[in-house]
């Protein structure tokens, strides 16, 4: 049996033969960490089995019992509590988070992706999607049937929003509570494996969004078993996950084991770690270092490249600095600064955290494209303090930062979930896309962005607890009332119409102007593959210049240029060297350069070589 540090399940199949009568299946060892319990009972397929303490591991309980490795249902009863509790390391919750657990034999799935050698992050383009709203059906199988669209688009990695179980049928996924299992309405463990297998057959890698900083408010039974949470620290979700208090060794192993299971048992290629700035850890070896080392070890064992992407709002280079250089060892992180610069420059919005970026948006955009972050130790009015730290442009590869025009957060956390594409001129959308896809960072698209989807992506929930549902509903309306929104204008998260209205409309890409924008995205992705300058990792080699009053910006990638005019007047834009070729333009009527300058029409984009 593998050690727990490599992510073994609490339920593992032994190599013993079937019982003599052949009716009860092979012996399984059931393991449970419940350090505060005095007695633990395993209930397996209706039969009770007392568990014994593990003499070698304090707090652990063991039981060996015959079970069907892919069908048996089970749970645990602690002391005199009559409630049957699901396994914290359950691989399947067929009846949801509140029901019994079910064994899953990961070895039984027949993979067809044997030749798959993995997909590295450098040079790749990610596509973020939510299983429940990507298709009308909202399942893994339905999403797999749309993968050819992503192949034709030209992306490399599909990033799934969280898929762990949560109460109800639909939600964003960030209220998951069974961190080793898969949401049944999506298709359960088998459905996720079929999706990954289908993606790999098409040459697409898969990234999974995982949440370690909190669990959902309903269906979370971990505190019944042990000190999974601590009051030493507090987060926006309440008590912090216990990463540094007594008992934290086991909690950290629990989270690392969950992460490794996705990479090993489901053959996922990378993980996106939600809000790592909320992982409060005062220990000498940070949890992220431990996780990074474990993933690196698994990658060496499997022969596949595996990677970790963090969501961090710290603007701290340590997050993406290798462990051997004193960093936390993540391979990349999201860069909200680039999004905020683009959003402010394209829309003119200046509320809340857009304020600093809207003062001189094109200057800020040029700064961010060349330095990695806008706030790199500068004053941040939204926080009321200085924020961030400079990146070492000579040592930090640009692909360690993700750049994007839309994300689930930046769309869904708006009051009405309206996309930037719902009201913005397609020519401006095309300019924003060009700066992301020819820019220095690892690009990421949000589902439907490629055709300028007009459908919103709103905040939706399906909480089964009426009190919790009402608290979420009133809390969201109260939040946006502070920004001037009337309560009736904020969609009800619990309304089925909010969820259904957030699904993509797959007829849009066949109509104008959506079809033209989709063709532009395909052109940009093809250019990125064909011209190594656009994937050059040297951040120090990136140059950008902008004119705030005339509303133009030119991005230099070696001998390549991306020039955008965001204004309403034609502008003569300097290219810095005579142009030799036009590679792409939007709209197509943009004229050819005249030597080292280019007359750009209003709201237009030109990409070429000098």
Language model: regions and residue ranges:
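Tight coil/turn sites that cap or link beta-strands
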Residues: 580, 586, 601-605
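Asparagine-centered strand-capping/turn motif at beta-strand->loop junctions
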Residues: 563-567
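The feature marks proteins involved in alpha-glucan
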Residues: 1-29, 48-50, 55-128, 135-138, ...
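Short proline/glycine-enriched turn/loop motifs at strand-loop junctions of beta-rich domains
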Residues: 33-39, 569, 577-579
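C-terminal beta-strand-rich structural cap/linker in extracellular carbohydrate-active enzymes
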Residues: 34, 70-71, 593-610
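Glycan-recognition and catalytic regions of carbohydrate-active enzymes
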Residues: 374-389, 445-446, 451-460, 482-560
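Substrate-binding/active-site clefts of carbohydrate-active enzymes
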Residues: 114-121, 130-301, 307, 319
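Conserved alpha/beta catalytic core and glycan-binding cleft of carbohydrate-active enzymes
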Residues: 288, 292-485
């Amino acid at each position: 049996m593998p050690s727990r540090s490599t992510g073994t399940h609490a339920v593992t199949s032994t190599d013993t033969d079937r019982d003599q009568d052949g009716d009860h299946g092979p012996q399984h060892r059931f393991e449970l960490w419940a350090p505060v319990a005095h007695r633990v009972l395993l209930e397996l397929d209706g039969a009770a089995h007392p568990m014994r303490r593990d003499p070698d591991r304090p707090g652990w309980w063991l039981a060996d019992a015959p079970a069907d490795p892919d069908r048996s249902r089970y749970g645990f009863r602690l002391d005199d509590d009559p409630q049957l509790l699901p396994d914290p390391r359950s691989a399947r919750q067929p009846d949801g988070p509140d029901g019994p657990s079910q064994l899953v034999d990961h070895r039984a799935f027949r993979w067809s992706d044997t030749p798959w050698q993995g997909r590295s992050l450098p040079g790749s383009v990610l596509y973020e999607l939510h299983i429940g709203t990507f298709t009308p059906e909202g399942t893994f199988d339905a999403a797999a049937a749309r993968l050819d669209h992503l192949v034709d688009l030209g992306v490399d990695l599909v990033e799934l929003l969280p898929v762990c179980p949560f109460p109800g049928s639909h939600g964003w996924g960030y209220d998951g509570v069974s961190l080793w299992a898969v949401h049944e309405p999506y298709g359960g463990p088998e459905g996720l494996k079929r999706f990954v297998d289908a993606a790999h057959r098409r040459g697409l890698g898969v990234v999974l969004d995982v949440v370690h900083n909190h669990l959902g408010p309903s269906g979370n039974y971990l505190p019944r078993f042990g000190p999974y949470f601590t009051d030493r620290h507090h987060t926006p979700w309440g008590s912090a996950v216990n990463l540094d208090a007594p008992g934290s060794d086991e909690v950290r192993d629990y989270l690392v084991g969950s992460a490794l299971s996705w990479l090993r048992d489901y053959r996922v290629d990378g993980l996106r770690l939600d809000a790592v700035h909320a992982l409060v850890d005062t220990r000498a070896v940070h949890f992220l270092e431990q996780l990074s080392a474990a993933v690196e070890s698994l990658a060496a064992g499997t022969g596949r490249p595996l990677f970790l992407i963090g969501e961090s709002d710290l603007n701290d280079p340590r997050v993406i600095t290798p462990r051997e250089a004193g960093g936390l060892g993540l391979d990349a992180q999201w860069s909200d600064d680039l999004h905020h610069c683009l959003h402010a420059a394209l829309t003119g919005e200046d509320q809340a955290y857009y304020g600093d970026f809207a003062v001189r948006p094109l200057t800020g955009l040029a700064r961010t494209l060349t330095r990695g972050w806008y706030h790199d130790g500068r004053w941040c009015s939204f926080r009321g303090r200085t924020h961030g730290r400079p990146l070492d442009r000579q040592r930090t590869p640009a692909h360690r930062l993700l750049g994007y025009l839309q994300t689930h957060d930046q769309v869904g956390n708006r009051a009405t979930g309206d996309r930037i594409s719902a009201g913005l001129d397609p020519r401006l959308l095309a300019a924003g896309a060009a700066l992301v896809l020819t820019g220095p960072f690892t690009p990421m698209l949000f589902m439907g962005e490629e055709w300028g989807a007009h459908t919103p992506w709103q905040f939706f929930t399906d909480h089964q607890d009426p009190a919790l549902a009402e608290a979420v509903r009133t809390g969201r309306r109260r939040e946006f009332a502070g920004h001037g929104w009337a309560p009736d204008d904020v969609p009800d998260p619990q309304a089925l119409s909010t969820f259904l209205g957030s699904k993509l409309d797959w007829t849009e890409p066949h109509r104008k102007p959506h079809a033209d924008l989709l063709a532009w995205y395909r052109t940009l992705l093809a250019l990125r593959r064909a011209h190594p300058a656009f994937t050059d990792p040297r951040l120090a080699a990136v140059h950008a210049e902008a004119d705030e009053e005339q509303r133009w910006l030119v991005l230099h990638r070696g001998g390549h240029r991306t020039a955008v005019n965001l204004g309403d007047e034609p502008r003569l834009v300097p290219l810095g060297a005579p142009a030799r070729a036009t590679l792409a333009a939007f709209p197509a009527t943009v004229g050819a350069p005249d030597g080292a300058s280019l007359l750009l029409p209003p709201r237009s984009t030109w990409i070429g070589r000098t």
